[in-house]
């Protein structure tokens, strides 16, 4: 017997008060459910994105990494030499903490480099912003999901080498932060996009968010990534690819 029922019977026996009305548990559950579904989303402005982008560039650690990646990709833009591609993979693994090196039992550096080099017209397709390259890299040899790495590899080549903003980055910080800005979006949906390498759906979500907030600055995809990462990251927590 619940404490509420005890209290109701006690009052009835004393005659001091009318019995408490029974609580409609279904109504309570329904009201709670409505409250849970009602979630106020945050908004974005061009100024917010620009500010955090500049903060990233000014960061003594991450800003220098950003400039190093830009310099190396401009110097070695093509993806036809397995040895150079291997070096670029290692660069991304180090600067972005994609942790590919921790999964040598699933894929090794030489194999991943061969997969990238083996993609037909890779560089031209990056220049054109071809989204189909991302899932090819992400699925790699079929033993590991490299979705986050693939988005970063393509995004940085597009931005640094060709000066275009056609790609968007996925990582754990974005997955956790994005639902704060998109009504009805849940992390489980984003995780499904990652696990199935559905880059098209993921990018469409990002584009809809930017359009809904009238974000029209140059490199808006790249600056959104910097905004979300710099605002919501946990400095002590390394991102894991898996």
Regions found by a protein language model. Give the residues of each.
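Generic structural signal for hydrophobic core residues of well-folded globular domains
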Residues: 7-14, 93-99, 137-141, 153-158, ...
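Aromatic-residue detector
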Residues: 32-40, 47, 130, 140-145, ...
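Residue-identity detector for glycine
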Residues: 15, 61-63, 101, 118, ...
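C-terminal accessory module of base-excision DNA glycosylases/AP lyases that mediates lesion recognition
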Residues: 1-16, 20-91, 166-242
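Helix-hairpin-helix/helix-loop-helix acidic hairpins
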Residues: 79-145
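Catalytic DNA-binding helix-loop module of base-excision-repair DNA glycosylases/AP lyases
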Residues: 134-180
């Amino acid at each position: 017997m619940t404490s509420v029922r005890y209290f109701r019977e006690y009052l009835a026996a004393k005659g001091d008060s009318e019995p408490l009305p029974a609580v409609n548990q279904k109504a309570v559950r329904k009201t709670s459910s409505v409250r849970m579904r009602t979630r106020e989303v945050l908004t974005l402005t061009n100024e917010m994105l620009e500010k955090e982008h500049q903060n990233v560039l000014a960061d003594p650690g991450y800003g220098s990494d950003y400039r190093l990646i830009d310099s190396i990709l401009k110097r070695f833009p093509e993806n036809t030499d397995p040895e150079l591609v291997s070096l670029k993979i290692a660069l991304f693994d180090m600067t972005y903490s994609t942790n590919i090196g921790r999964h040598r039992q699933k894929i090794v550096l030489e194999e991943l480099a061969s997969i990238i080099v083996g993609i037909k017209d890779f560089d031209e397709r990056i220049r054109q912003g071809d989204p189909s390259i991302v899932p090819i890299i992400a699925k790699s040899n079929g033993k590991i999901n490299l979705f986050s790495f693939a988005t970063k590899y393509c995004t940085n080549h597009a931005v640094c080498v060709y000066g275009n903003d056609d790609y968007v980055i996925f990582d754990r910080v974005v997955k956790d932060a994005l639902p704060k800005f998109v009504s009805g979006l849940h992390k489980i949906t984003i995780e499904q996009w990652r696990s199935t390498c559905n880059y098209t759906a993921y990018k469409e979500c990002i584009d809809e968010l930017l359009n809904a907030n009238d974000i029209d600055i140059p490199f808006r995809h790249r600056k959104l990534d910097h905004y979300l990462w710099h605002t919501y990251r946990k400095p002590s927590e390394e991102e894991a690819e898996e």
